[in-house]
Amino acid sequence: MNYIKISKHDTSNGVGIRVVLWVSGCSLHCPGCHNQEAQDPDTGWEFTAESMAELIEALDKPYIAGLTVSGGHPLEPYNCDEVYQILNRVRSALPSKTIWLYTGYKWEEALRMHCGGTSPVDVISLCDVVVDGAYEADKRNIALAWRGSSNQRVINAQESLRQNRVILQCE
C-alpha cells in the first residue's frame, strides 16, 4: 500500500489534535475531490515498517487524540489488508487513542463490500468513528464538522456495529 503523507498535528479530520494517514488510491473520483493527487494507488511512498514506526511515534504523545485514516480511499480492495494491519497495531500499542476513518462509500455499501482477504467490516470494527459518503459539490457546507458535504455522516462505528444500524456520532 502506498500513502501520500502522514500529517502529525491535524485538527480538521476528527476530534482533537490528530495524526492523519493519507493513503493512496481511490476509484470513486468524486467531482470536486480535495485529494485528487491521492487517487492514483501508485502515488506516494510504500508504507513500510519505518512508516509504521513513524506513525506510532507521532501518535504516542499525550496531546494527540488519535489516528484518522483518509485518502485516497482506505477501503479500496488493495488497501484493506494493510489498513487493517495498521489499525490493529495502533489499537494494540496505543489503546487509548481513537481511530477515525473516512470512506466515500455509504456505511451500508461498505458493510456489503468484499475485498478478498480482509473485508471493510474487519477494518471498520477497529474504528471508533467512520465518516461516510462521497463528497458532493452541490451539497457542500463548510459549517459542518469533519465533513465537506451534507450527505456525509459522522457515524459511531462501534455502536452501529453492535445495534446493526447507523448511530450518528454527531449531526
Where in this protein do the model-derived segments appear?
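N-terminal [4Fe-4S]-dependent radical SAM core
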Residues: M1-W22, S27, N35-D42, V166-I167, ...
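Conserved Radical SAM active-site core
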Residues: N2-Y3, I17, N35-P120
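Short cysteine-rich clusters marking metal-coordination/redox-active sites
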Residues: C30
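Short glycine-rich, flexible loops that bind phosphorylated cofactors or substrates
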Residues: E76, D138-K139
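P-loop/Walker A phosphate-binding loop and immediately adjacent motor/lid segment at beta-alpha junctions
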Residues: V83-R91, R140-E171
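Receiver (REC) domain switch/active-site residues of two-component response regulators
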Residues: D128
